[in-house]
Amino acid sequence: MIPLTSITDPVTDPGLAVSCRGIRKHFGEGETRVEALRGVDFTARAGELSFLVGPSGCGKTTLLSVIAGILDPSGGDLTVLGERVDALSARDRILFRRKNLGFVFQQYNLLPALTAAENVAVPLLAAGARRPPSLERAEALLDRLGLGARTGALPATLTGGQQQRVAIARALVHEPRLVVCDEPTAALDHESGESVMELLADNVVRPDRAVIVVTHDSRVLHHADSIARMDDGRIVNTTRPGDSLPAATQRST
């Protein structure tokens, strides 16, 4: 069992990619108030692939959205890649996310008028990179994900699983230091899911990078460096490879 809190300083410890201390998030007020996160303590280390598992509605996606800066926490301390994100101005927060983070959410949001390769290259082109090498890198990533023959296809002609792989390639193309993924293998068969997880694992070979994955897919848990289980808006346990998972964790991933 791993302690749920860290005694290190998340701002000065280069090994901590993400540090959540007492993170709370609620929606609504009064009788409609819902406590989605109830004082979450969670860390993700650089050079590791961290998983969040637990029953539907337990707060996994909300926590991921807070870490990604899409939702503001209602309370607690959040440090991402050494930055106290809540202390940044709105503009600096956007620039920080654009430079350092990659996102894979269940809504792929592919641009319908662009090809698969062009969609993947968007982060590079938005940062001012030249078009030919950007497309070349995009095509190489798509090829690794089994879409080498579909790089010129429009999103409307792709299956849901193919669109998901395009979104994953887009999240990785600019080599972000932190990648957050919500159910990245949900629409994929086992072989495609393994290709995705291998690509994500490759991203953490460098010690300054980290990946956080929310999943219900127990088939991919063997890729994890750590597995944190959530229930009712809290982290209830964290395990490492070789630890035996509690039965409840195995049932509710």
List each model region and its residues.
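ABC-family P-loop ATPase nucleotide-binding domain
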Residues: 1-26, 237-253
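H-loop (His-switch) and adjacent beta-strand-loop-beta switch element
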Residues: 227-240
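ABC family nucleotide-binding domain
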Residues: 16-230
